[in-house]
Each structure stands twice: as structure tokens, then as C-alpha cells.
């Protein structure tokens, strides 16, 4: 049985070589296009893909059949992946705000054991990213496309203390707040 190849190489091997990605179907819509003879119906799928180790992407696909729309969305999501630095491999480094259109998303780092406190499409992004503890709130648009784009926008803005220190020409210890001094300062004020 001969394997089919496309212009970029062996397609089947490439798909089998990337099983480390998990995907989550966020939304599927029935869409219609009005043509001369009536309406043509199709489907639009929104998929989030990630390796649960700090990489995530989303894609949308349209087709006449649901499986084909999901396949197209998954391929687009794999092409549009971004890398996010996670603190201790479980949460964000700092509070972030993301925007897209009328959608606004606020994400906050959370202590260990908090879990993912997020609604709808944001939860799918965090699960595929590998975040274990986060608190988030969606303000404005509840459209899943806008919520995911706003979440990705916020995640792109995240910076690790190491990158901030490197950019400023300082040490990481100078960037991070000192944990021992914070309670002592509060006790001195009281």
C-alpha cells in the first residue's frame, strides 16, 4: 500500500510524529451561504490545541461536513501555536489583561491547589496550555472567538522574570519581590 505524499513531504508521517498535542473542540456552528438556488449549509469549528507544557494555539475551520471543519481547524491551530513561560510549570508569572474586539479577559496567577477558575473557552485554552492554577474573568463579549483571541492576546503579553531582568540588565533577584521582607513590613506598620 503506497503512502500518499504532498509537495511538502510525507503527510502521514508528519501527522503521526506529533501525537504530543491534545485538542479541544470549543464551538461548532452551523453556517449558511445564500446562493442563486437557495441556501448552502456548512459548519464552522473552533478548536484549541496544546501540548500541556506551555504551547497553545487555536484555529477555526469551515467545511460542508463537521469532521472536515474540525480537521481544518486543528491544522490551523497547530500552525498558529505560541509558547508561554509558566511559573513552576503550573501558573502564570503575573496578572495579565487581554483584549480583542469587545472582549476583555483578566487572568491572575493563583496559589497551588486553586485549580482552573475560568469559564467556557478560556478553560479550554488553559487546559491545553498546561496551566493548573489560574483565576480568570471574562468581561464584555461572550463570543467564544473573541474570548479565545483575548486570552491568547493576554498570554502573548506575559513575561518571565528572567526575560524582564535580562532586558533591564539586572539580576532576577532584583526583579522579584523578596518574600521574607513583605510580612515584616506589614507587621511594622501595624
Swiss-Prot record:
UniProt xrefs under InterPro entries: Ribosomal_Su5_D2-typ_SF, Ribosomal_uS5, Ribosomal_uS5_bac-type, Ribosomal_uS5_C, Ribosomal_uS5_N, Ribosomal_uS5_N_CS, Ribsml_uS5_D2-typ_fold_subgr
GO biological process: translation
Residue numbers spanned by region Disordered: 156-190
GO cellular-component term (any): small ribosomal subunit
Subunit structure: Part of the 30S ribosomal subunit. Contacts proteins S4 and S8.
Record function comment: With S4 and S12 plays an important role in translational accuracy.
Name the UniProt record assigns to this protein: Small ribosomal subunit protein uS5
Organism: Ruegeria pomeroyi (strain ATCC 700808 / DSM 15171 / DSS-3)
Gene name tied to this protein: rpsE
Amino acid at each position: 500500500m503506497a503512502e500518499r505524499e504532498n509537495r511538502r513531504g510525507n503527510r502521514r508521517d508528519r501527522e503521526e510524529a506529533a501525537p504530543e498535542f491534545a485538542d479541544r473542540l470549543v464551538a461548532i456552528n452551523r453556517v449558511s451561504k445564500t446562493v442563486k438556488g437557495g441556501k448552502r449549509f456548512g459548519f464552522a469549528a473552533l478548536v484549541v490545541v496544546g501540548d500541556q507544557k506551555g504551547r497553545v494555539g487555536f484555529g477555526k475551520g469551515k467545511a460542508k461536513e463537521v469532521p472536515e471543519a474540525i480537521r481544518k481547524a486543528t491544522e490551523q491551530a497547530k500552525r498558529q501555536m505560541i509558547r508561554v513561560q509558566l511559573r513552576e510549570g503550573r501558573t502564570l508569572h503575573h496578572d495579565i489583561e487581554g483584549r480583542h474586539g469587545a472582549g476583555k479577559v483578566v487572568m491572575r496567577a493563583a496559589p497551588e491547589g486553586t485549580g482552573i477558575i475560568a469559564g467556557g473557552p478560556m478553560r479550554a485554552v488553559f487546559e491545553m496550555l498546561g496551566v493548573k492554577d489560574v483565576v480568570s474573568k471574562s468581561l464584555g463579549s461572550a463570543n467564544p472567538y473573541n474570548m479565545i483571541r483575548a486570552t491568547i492576546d493576554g498570554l502573548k503579553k506575559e513575561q518571565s522574570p528572567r526575560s524582564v531582568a535580562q532586558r533591564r540588565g539586572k539580576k532576577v533577584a532584583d526583579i522579584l519581590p523578596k518574600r521574607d521582607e513583605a510580612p515584616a513590613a506589614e507587621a511594622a506598620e501595624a
